[in-house]
Amino acid sequence: NDKRTVAIDMKWRSETYYAELLREGEHLQLALYAGLIEQAKGNAPTALGYFILESGALYITAADIFPNAQVRRPPDGVTVATLLGRAQATWTWRKGQLDAGVVEVVPEDPPDEFQGPDGTLPVKGPNGKFDRDHLVLLGGWER
């Protein structure tokens, strides 16, 4: 009678992208889910993962949970707690900028000067189709 909890996010497509998020330790959305599950149940999920609807692929952070899942472990030192801590540090940094009246417009492939203080999430700039679609609605970055 196995009662382990696993947080899985279902995605339509982009199998390689989501597998790499896990491998690179950039799965913030899953970390947020894990934090919420831990608050609600008192225990953190055993593993986190993405199920890709288009291909049926399942990528997960721990072995021996789903027989056909592909394991993608984050780098050593990347945990739910570290991801959430970096998100909190990023929020604090950005909130300080807003309080000071600073709104930073980050270019594609931003230089180091756009990166936050140590302990914050990396600043990557606009991301292809997804961000550009939203930025056009806001009045910029048309091509």
Predicted features by range, described:
Residues 1-143:
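RecB-family 4Fe-4S metal-dependent nuclease core
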